Amino acid sequence: MEAPEEDFTGRVWFGPLAPPVHDAALNTLAVMFSPGARTAWHRHVEGQVLYVAHGNGIVANETGDRVEVAAGDTVIIPPGEVHWHGATPDAHMMHLSLTTGGPTEWMGRKVNEQDYAG
């Protein structure tokens, strides 16, 4: 399904890797970003693991740490860290997202062009 506009910039699609299980502790998603697309600022109570399955992307946090990622890379985002992730301007990116501890907490603000450009 297409991701909601209020939490993303650009075209993003996502879907579960497995059917939801009542009271499941693990949330698994496949997320596909079009070139330049990205999440808004958000955090996960118990952190997040991203595995890049295809393309090139960026993962950054509020303190200015930023890493460019490519297919085969894994990124571990610490619990509670406010961050964003998405595709580079010239490539699609698909990652697998693994989280526990409940839903994503959106910060209510999108990543501006200056933060996106680094």
Regions found by a protein language model. Give the residues of each.
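A generic structural signal for short beta-strands and their flanking turns/coil linkers
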Residues: 10-13, 24-29, 46-48, 55, ...
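Ligand-binding loop in jelly-roll beta-barrel domains
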Residues: 22, 58, 66, 70-71, ...
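Conserved hydrophobic/aromatic positions in well-ordered beta-strands
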Residues: 29-31, 50, 96
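A short beta-strand-loop-beta hairpin characteristic of the jelly-roll/cupin
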Residues: 38, 43-71, 81
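A short, N-terminal "cap"/entry segment at the start of jelly-roll beta-barrel domains
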Residues: 1-26, 105-118
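Conserved short histidine dyad/triad with adjacent acidic residue
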Residues: 13-16, 27-44, 79
